[in-house]
Amino acid sequence: MTNQTQLSSKTYDTHFAKLTAEQLAENAKKKVIIGMSGGVDSSVSAFILQQQGYQVEGLFMKNWEEDDDTDYCTAAADLADAQAVADKLGMKLHKINFAAEYWDNVFEHFLNEYKAGRTPNPDILCNKEIKFKAFLEYAAEDLGADYIATGHYVRRSGDDNNAQLLRGLDANKDQSYFLYTLSHKQVGQSLFPVGDIEKPIVRQIAEDLGLATAKKKDSTGICFIGERKFKDFLARYLPAQPGEIRTVGGKVVGRHDGLMYHTLGQRKGLGIGGVKGLSEDPFYVVEKDLINNVLVVAQGHDNSALLSSGLIATQLHWVDRQPIRENLRCTVKTRYRQTDIACEIQPIDDDTIRVIFDDPQIAVTPGQSAVFYQGEVCLGGGVIEEQLK
């Protein structure tokens, strides 16, 4: 039995092919648990799944325990929005608290990386450990799901047993960078209903339906920090060690509040004024010297100290779970929304690769992820261990 809503959307009808009676009947045998965040993408994803005939139920995950920062914590409001959408769609909404798993498997790693002077990406780890592990296991084992679904802007191809992860159709919203740790098995157990459409269409469908989330702005910032100031948040968990800011040549040009507050390639927020004997060109972070607690800067966005010829990556995850044994031509992103960089992967061992760029790149940052593609297909990726000069 499906819980297909009586609501309708002309925008949906325009952009999605009408399924045959046989397809609807086949889908009706499948139960899908969709992660409901209280945002517009998961809201519309739930509607799309209903229109496609699936048995659809929602699950709201609470991954962070609130503190006194009630101005910043949106969990209660997000739950209310998710419930309003579920009610509108006539869909059951389950609730689960994964805060303990999140603390152990995501947040502590995040803090340890910052202590080591690296710049981690907790959203990637959250997808790996929470959304496509804890959530997937709970949905399958406790709720009897055949699939989970999320509002991510990615696509999948192939059958459930040999699925590939593809970029989302909306290049501006593509989130495959954040999902590279998934295996082909996890991709095959997941549905991504908005991956085949563009964001404005998602919003229009939500407006057609009168959903509470139709005009809700996209969330920004790290999931557990929300909209609060990153520096203030980090200072509560890690003691800062102020130190000197020096040029590559060793000239002291300022003070920093703590190396953890800065990232390679950063220009804004350094607090360096005009320096006697130096040009007016802006300063950029080129190195974090942990041993001496010195932030090293250089002037000019095209300064050679900013450039890398490649990188070393470890903690590799390939979607097909097969290690790369030969040199491979492909493209790479070293940060989200970056234009693809042509490169060659050179395997060192099963969990370490050298990546050589066709052209030097700026701000290759240890702790961030390098994610590899061949055309539309996301091959996988790894964590940047070091940059190559």
Swiss-Prot record:
Its EC number is 2.8.1.13. The record marks 152, 368 as: Interaction with tRNA. GO terms for biological process: tRNA wobble position uridine thiolation. It comes from Actinobacillus pleuropneumoniae serotype 5b (strain L20). Catalyzes the 2-thiolation of uridine at the wobble position (U34) of tRNA, leading to the formation of s(2)U34. It is found in: Cytoplasm. GO terms for molecular function: ATP binding; tRNA binding; tRNA-uridine 2-sulfurtransferase activity. It catalyses: S-sulfanyl-L-cysteinyl-[protein] + uridine(34) in tRNA + AH2 + ATP = 2-thiouridine(34) in tRNA + L-cysteinyl-[protein] + A + AMP + diphosphate + H(+). Keywords: ATP-binding, Cytoplasm, Disulfide bond, Nucleotide-binding, RNA-binding, Transferase, tRNA processing, tRNA-binding. Disulfide bonds join 126-223. Coiled coil: none annotated. Pfam families: tRNA_Me_trans, tRNA_Me_trans_C, tRNA_Me_trans_M. This is tRNA-specific 2-thiouridylase MnmA. ATP binds at residues 35-42, 61, 151. The gene is mnmA. Residues 121-123 are annotated as: Interaction with target base in tRNA. GO terms for cellular component: cytoplasm. The lineage of its organism: Bacteria, Pseudomonadati, Pseudomonadota, Gammaproteobacteria, Pasteurellales. The active site is at residues 126, 223. Belongs to the MnmA/TRMU family. Its main location: cytoplasm. Residues 173-175, 335-336 are annotated as: Interaction with tRNA.
